[in-house]
Amino acid sequence: MFNGDLDEDCCVMEAVLSQLTYKSGADRYKLCPTRKGNGSILYGNTWRSFLKYGEPDAATGIRPMICRNKDPDAVGKYLSKAQEIYPHLQEIFEEFRDYHFSTFDFSHVMMNRNYDVDWHFDAGNIGESVVIAMGDFTGGSTQIKDGTGVITNLDSHNNPQQFDGSKIEHRVEPFEGERYSLVFFKN
């Protein structure tokens, strides 16, 4: 699928990402409310078994709990909705990583479309993350803030950037246009 040329591979990845349906989960939506069609979705397992409530039973009016499927490879973990809907993405993410940041090990990928999240820490992440953004947009750099409040712009547009989001406060700079991003991380 990819050929090793970062700009060309980002165009291919953008085409893949543009085919997905984006709908942020409740916690991600609270962090950054978005318009329909935009959002942030997790690709990787989760400890949360509960997914949503189903439609009320006609006879009893009780709404059943709909739970995620167990991850067969991880005890006590469940498959994210994106893993179930788009299982082919794992190989795509691994191939992209192998070409462009081959020594980085990841277990999860956060997929974002027009998700201009404000300052935050990635409390659940373990170690460093790699972020890369693609699309036709201006602005939208990944901004990091050091302990003294100094802000540094990381140009993540078709350019992988690595930092520890669990220890370094960061956000997406305001942008205009269509912006997709991937955050590869361990959890």
Model-identified regions with their sequence ranges:
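Fe(II)/2-oxoglutarate oxygenase catalytic core
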Residues: M1-Q161, S166-N187
